[in-house]
Amino acid sequence: MQFVSVDAWGKKAEYIRNGLNFNYMMDNVDEFLDRIPVRNSVTFIITYNNLSVTSLDKLLEGILELRKRHSKTYQRVWFDIPLLRQPAWQQITLLPESYQAIHEANIEYMRENSGEEKGLHIFKDFEIQKMLRNLAYWRKNANASTQNKKNFYAFFNEHDRRRLTNFETVFPEM
């Protein structure tokens, strides 16, 4: 089993994980699954944070596509979605309540692509339950603290200065 740590899709993933070439990584995942067709799998570890929310839909679609392409006799593509707890200013709980609708739409997409009758090319019940658990935590612990917002702003301003990146270009919706 190989583990792939990625928290978003495309340029957003590259921003979060400085130095990542997202397309190269996905090509390598595909090649690994092609070249070693038996007794292996890939697990995506998605550390769910406030920068993950707006592109998780594309990442879920990518995971489902990999399942369709590579899971013929057993599940070869997995994912886990633990919540980021620290730093507090990067938790999903800092986001406005309106972002929960994005998360809910992802849960609905997963439900539409679940069900044992569809074989291996589905989202499992326990994966949907993890997403529901994350939503429940978010609702219970929503915390738009002014200090956390200041820390978020300060961190990513410094991040952009040091790494020559641009938060507003990569995350215009935020």
Where is each model-derived feature located?
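Radical SAM enzyme core and accessory elements
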Residues: 104, 111-174
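Radical SAM/AdoMet-radical enzyme domain recognition
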Residues: 1-84
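Flexible glycine/acidic-rich beta-alpha junction loops that bind and position SAM and/or redox cofactors
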Residues: 48-54, 72-105, 116-119, 124-135
